[in-house]
C-alpha cells in the first residue's frame, strides 16, 4: 500500500449531527462490520466507552478504517461537543481532508462554524445528514452555508425532495445520474422530469466552479461552455486542495442514502498525503525546516493521539516520512530517548488489528509506549526532526477536586495522570497556597466525564468544589510596634525584644527588610532571625490569613539578654510585633486581576459587555476581526470568572471563546472584601 491508496478523513461538526452514525454506515456498507450499530442502542464501533454509551455522545476521537474499491479511508470520528474540541484538533492534525457533517433540520450549526474555523486552510467537504427526518430542510441549510462561507460552497448533488421536505433520492451532478436506497444499497433511478431544468442549471454552476480552479479548464469551458465529468472532477479536486471549492453532498447515515456517493467523492476529490504542502518542523539545532511527505525518506512520524484505557495504551501516529515497522528503534527529540517499538496496530473502535508496518501517509498505533506522549515526534536518530504537534486551547474552566477519603489521595493522583495521557487538554495543578488540587478544562462536561472515569477505572470517588481565590493583604499606613518575647522555664529562659516600623511600599511584592539599630540594642547576629520571623509572618495576614505583600519592615530598636536571648526568641518577638502592628496599619485585601480577551460575533457584543459590568470588569478595547466578530479586551477580577466559560457559552450560543491570564493584584472593593473575609473565616472554622 502507498500514500496514493490512502485517504485520511476527519468527521467534524456539531454534536448530534450524526458523525458516529455516518462512520458506522461507512463501515457497514463496505463490509467493515456485519451489523449496523446505532447510537441509541449503544453498539456503534466508534462510541465504545462506557461514558459515551451512557451519555449517547462521543467523548474521544475514534477510528473507523474503511476499505472502498481498494483504497483505505481512515475515517476519524471526532466529538462534536465543544468540551472535547481537543479531540477534533488531533483528528485535523492527522487528516488531509475533513467532512463537515450537519443535520438538515439545524441549518448552519455553531459546530459547523467552529469546525470550519478550526480547519484553517485544510481541505474540506460538507455532508448534510439526516435528510430523511421530519423537519429536515436541505434548501434552507444550503442557503445558510452559502450565506456564511460564500462562493466556495459547491453542491455536487441535487436532492429529490418529497412534499414533506424529505430527501428520497439524490442526483449526482458530476455524472448526471440519480440514486435511491433499496434494501440498504444504492440503486440507480431516473432523474425526475420536473427536475431537468434545475439539474441543468446546477450542473452549469458546478462546471463553472470546477473551471475556476484551473486556467486550462477555464479556457476549455469558455470555448465550449461544457466540461466532461472527468474534467469537472479534475477541477474540483484542484479546488478542494487549494480551498477554493467545498463540495456539498447530502443523505442519511441511518438509511445509507448518499453515503456511497460520499465514499466515491472522497476517493475522487480528497487529497492524499503527498498532495499536501511540506510540514513546518525544526531540526536538532532548533532551526526551522520543512519536512515533505516522502515514502523513501528517513522515518518521521507524529504522535497525534494517545489511547489509554482498560484495553491498554496505544500511541496513534501519522507517518510523515519513510515507513514505521515493528522492529524499529526511533528517536524521540522531546525526551531524548530512543524508543524500541512494540507491536503495530490498525485501530477500529476499541479493537486493534496487528499490522507489520505503517507506510508514509498512513495512520496506525504503537502499543505500550509508556514514555511517549501526544505531540511527540518519533524519527530516525540520524535525521532528527521535531514535527509540530497540536495547539490545544487554553483551559478556561476550573474546579477543585478531592477524594472523598484521605486513603484515595494517591489513587486520585495516579488516575489523573493516566487520564491526562489520553486527554492532554486538561491541566492539573496542586496549589500549595490554597491547599487545593485544581483541575482545568474546556467546560463542565469534560470535568464531569473525567470524574466519572476516575470512578469507573480507578475506583476514586471525586468531589468537586469552587477553587479558592488567592487573595493578598497589604497595609495602607505606617505603624511602629514592639514585640517582646520572654519565657522562663526553670534555669535558662528565652528573651527577645524588637521595635519595628511597618510601612507600605510599592517597589516589590516581597517584603523589604531593613535595620536601623544604633548602640547595639539588638546584636547584628540576631538580624537574620528577625527577618526570618517577619517573612514567615507575612505568609498569613491578619484579615483573612492571606500572604502580606508590598510591606517594608525596619528594625529600629530592641533589647537582649546576654544569656537568655536566642535566634528563636528574636524570631518569635518579630512575629509578635507583626501581629500587633498590622491590625492598626489599615490592612486591606488585594484581589487578582486578569486580562480577558473574548472573541464573539458582533451581535452578542451588548450582552457580553453588560455581563462584564456585572462582574466588575473594565473594558479596555475592542478590535474587529474582519469576519463579523469582535475581540473584546477587558480586565476582570479572578473571583468573578469562576463560571464564565459556562455563562459565555449560554450568552453566545457557544459562539464565544476567550482567554484569561493573570496580570496583577489590585485593592479589593469593600463589599468584595467583606465577602472574601467571611468565606475565609467560614473555611477556617470548617477545617
Show which residues each predicted segment covers.
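Structural and coupling elements of P-loop NTPases
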Residues: 1-687
Amino acid at each position: 500500500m502507498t500514500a496514493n491508496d490512502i485517504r485520511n478523513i476527519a468527521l467534524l461538526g456539531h454534536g448530534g449531527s450524526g458523525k458516529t452514525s455516518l462512520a458506522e454506515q461507512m463501515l457497514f456498507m463496505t463490509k467493515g462490520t456485519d451489523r449496523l450499530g446505532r447510537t441509541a442502542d449503544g453498539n456503534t464501533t466508534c462510541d465504545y466507552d462506557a461514558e459515551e454509551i451512557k451519555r449517547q455522545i462521543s467523548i474521544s476521537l475514534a477510528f473507523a478504517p474503511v476499505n472502498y474499491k481498494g483504497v483505505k479511508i481512515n475515517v476519524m470520528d471526532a466529538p462534536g461537543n465543544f468540551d472535547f474540541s481537543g479531540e477534533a484538533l488531533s483528528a485535523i492534525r492527522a487528516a488531509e481532508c475533513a467532512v463537515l457533517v450537519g443535520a438538515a433540520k439545524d441549518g448552519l450549526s455553531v459546530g459547523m462554524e467552529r469546525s470550519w474555523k478550526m480547519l484553517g486552510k485544510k481541505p474540506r467537504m460538507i455532508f448534510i445528514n439526516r435528510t430523511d427526518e421530519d423537519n429536515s430542510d436541505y434548501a434552507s441549510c444550503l442557503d445558510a452555508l452559502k450565506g456564511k462561507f460564500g462562493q466556495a460552497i459547491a453542491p455536487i448533488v441535487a436532492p429529490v425532495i418529497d412534499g414533506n421536505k424529505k430527501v428520497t433520492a439524490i442526483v449526482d451532478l458530476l455524472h448526471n445520474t440519480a440514486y435511491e436506497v433499496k434494501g440498504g444499497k444504492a440503486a440507480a433511478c431516473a432523474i425526475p422530469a420536473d427536475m431537468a431544468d434545475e439539474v441543468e442549471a446546477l450542473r452549469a454552476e458546478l462546471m463553472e466552479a470546477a473551471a475556476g480552479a484551473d486556467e486550462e479548464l477555464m479556457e476549455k469551458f469558455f470555448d465550449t461552455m461544457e466540461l466532461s465529468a472527468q474534467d469537472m472532477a479534475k477541477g474540483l479536486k484542484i479546488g478542494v486542495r487549494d480551498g477554493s471549492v467545498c463540495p456539498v453532498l447530502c443523505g442519511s447515515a441511518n438509511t445509507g442514502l448518499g453515503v456511497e456517493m460520499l465514499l466515491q467523492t472522497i476517493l475522487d476529490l480528497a487529497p492524499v498525503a503527498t498532495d499536501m504542502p511540506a510540514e513546518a518542523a525544526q531540526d536538532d539545532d532548533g532551526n526551522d525546516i520543512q519536512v515533505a511527505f516522502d515514502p523513501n525518506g528517513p522515518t518521521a512520524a507524529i504522535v497525534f493521539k494517545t489511547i489509554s484505557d482498560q484495553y491498554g495504551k496505544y500511541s496513534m501516529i501519522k507517518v510523515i516520512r519513510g515507513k514505521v515497522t515493528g522492529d524499529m528503534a526511533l528517536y524521540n527529540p522531546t525526551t531524548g530517548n530512543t524508543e524500541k517499538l512494540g507491536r503495530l496496530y490498525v485501530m477500529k473502535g476499541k479493537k486493534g488489528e496487528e499490522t507489520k508496518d505503517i507506510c508514509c501517509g498512513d495512520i496506525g498505533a504503537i502499543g505500550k509506549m509508556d514514555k511517549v506522549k501526544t505531540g511527540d515526534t518519533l524519527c530516525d536518530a540520524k535525521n532528527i526532526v521535531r514535527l509540530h504537534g497540536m495547539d490545544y486551547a487554553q483551559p478556561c474552566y476550573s474546579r477543585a477536586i478531592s477524594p472523598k477519603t484521605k486513603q484515595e489521595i494517591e489513587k486520585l493522583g495516579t488516575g489523573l495522570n493516566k487520564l491526562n495521557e489520553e486527554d492532554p487538554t486538561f491541566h492539573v495543578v496542586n496549589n500549595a497556597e490554597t491547599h487545593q488540587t485544581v483541575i482545568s478544562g474546556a467546560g463542565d462536561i469534560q470535568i464531569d466525564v473525567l470524574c466519572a472515569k476516575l470512578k469507573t477505572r480507578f475506583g476514586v470517588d471525586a468531589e468537586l468544589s469552587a477553587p479558592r481565590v488567592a487573595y493578598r493583604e497589604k497595609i495602607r499606613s505606617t505603624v511602629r510596634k514592639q514585640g517582646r518575647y520572654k519565657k522562663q522555664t526553670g534555669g535558662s529562659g528565652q528573651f527577645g525584644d524588637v521595635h519595628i516600623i511597618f510601612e507600605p511600599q510599592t517597589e516589590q511584592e516581597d517584603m523589604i527588610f531593613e535595620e536601623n539599630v544604633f548602640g547595639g540594642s539588638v546584636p547584628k547576629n540576631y538580624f537574620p532571625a528577625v527577618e526570618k520571623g517577619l517573612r514567615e509572618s507575612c505568609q498569613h495576614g491578619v484579615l483573612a490569613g492571606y500572604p502580606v505583600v508590598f510591606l517594608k519592615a525596619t528594625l529600629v530598636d530592641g533589647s537582649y539578654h546576654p544569656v537568655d536571648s536566642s535566634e528563636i526568641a528574636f524570631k518569635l518577638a518579630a512575629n509578635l510585633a507583626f501581629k500587633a502592628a498590622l491590625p492598626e496599619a489599615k490592612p486591606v485585601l488585594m484581589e487578582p486581576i486578569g486580562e480577558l480577551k473574548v472573541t464573539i460575533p458582533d451581535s452578542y457584543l451588548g450582552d457580553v459587555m453588560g455581563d462584564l459590568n456585572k462582574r466588575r470588569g473594565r473594558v479596555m478595547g475592542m478590535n474587529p476581526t474582519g469576519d463579523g466578530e469582535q475581540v473584546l479586551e477587558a480586565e476582570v477580577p479572578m473571583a468573578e470568572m469562576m463560571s464564565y466559560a459556562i455563562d459565555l457559552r449560554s450568552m453566545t450560543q457557544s459562539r464565544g471563546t476567550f482567554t484569561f491570564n493573570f496580570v496583577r493584584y489590585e485593592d479589593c472593593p469593600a463589599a468584595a472584601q467583606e465577602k472574601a473575609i467571611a468565606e475565609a473565616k467560614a473555611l477556617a472554622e470548617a477545617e
